[in-house]
């Protein structure tokens, strides 16, 4: 029977939502296997990382390398590895596929990762944000990494603009007094900007 706080029911609903998420991601994974295999243009470090983390066995790793030595195209070898990942699919498979090392080595994976993120967002929004399940937290970490990279780019652009502005201001302060004096005194003599005149005279001291 359900407890007074309704927690058994909530737990069941959360499990159903997580299962639905995994099913959606698995379906998308099957559709994108060919695209993923085309994006991974070399076996290293992809196959090695799968072997090291026991996503594939040592024997299968050697079989895949033997296929490469027999001049089987790399994309077909990678496709075989993806078929193995499909058999044991969960969210950790996606996190391993789209980890930082693979993103740097195989930049074509970036667009594919975004397609998975877009597919996952509706289901993630319905989940309890305090969920401690490994698959959910790993996926959220993956999404946070992408957002952090965007923030770093924005910060870099802002810093560059600040440096340019400082350089322009510093160069402006090199104006000579003979250029400064006629302008300021001209304003004063014509009763223009009279309130600004004392301040401008003070700024004169800043000039070389």
From Swiss-Prot:
<protein>
    <recommendedName>
        <fullName>Component of Sp100-rs</fullName>
    </recommendedName>
</protein>
<dbReference type="InterPro" id="IPR004865">
    <property type="entry name" value="HSR_dom"/>
</dbReference>
<dbReference type="InterPro" id="IPR043563">
    <property type="entry name" value="Sp110/Sp140/Sp140L-like"/>
</dbReference>
<dbReference type="Pfam" id="PF03172">
    <property type="entry name" value="HSR"/>
</dbReference>
<feature type="domain" description="HSR">
    <location>
        <begin position="6"/>
        <end position="121"/>
    </location>
</feature>
<dbReference type="GO" id="GO:0005634">
    <property type="term" value="C:nucleus"/>
</dbReference>
């Amino acid at each position: 029977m359900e407890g007074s706080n309704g927690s058994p029911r909530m737990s069941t609903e959360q499990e159903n939502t997580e299962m639905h998420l995994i099913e959606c991601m698995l379906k998308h994974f099957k559709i994108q296997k060919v695209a993923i295999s085309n994006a991974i243009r070399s076996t290293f470090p992809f196959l090695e990382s799968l072997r090291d983390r026991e996503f594939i066995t040592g024997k299968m790793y050697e079989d895949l390398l033997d296929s490469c030595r027999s001049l089987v195209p790399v994309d077909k070898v990678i496709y075989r590895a993806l078929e193995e990942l499909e058999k044991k699919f969960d969210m950790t498979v996606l996190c391993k596929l789209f980890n930082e090392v693979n993103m740097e080595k195989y930049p074509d994976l970036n667009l594919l990762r975004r397609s998975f993120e877009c597919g996952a967002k509706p289901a993630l929004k319905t989940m309890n944000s305090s969920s401690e399940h490994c698959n959910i937290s790993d996926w959220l970490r993956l999404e946070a990494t992408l957002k952090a990279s965007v923030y770093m780019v924005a910060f870099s652009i802002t810093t560059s603009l600040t440096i340019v502005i400082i350089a322009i201001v510093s160069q402006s302060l090199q104006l000579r007094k003979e250029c400064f004096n006629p302008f300021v005194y001209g304003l004063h003599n014509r009763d223009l900007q009279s309130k600004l005149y004392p301040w401008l005279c003070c700024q004169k001291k800043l000039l070389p």
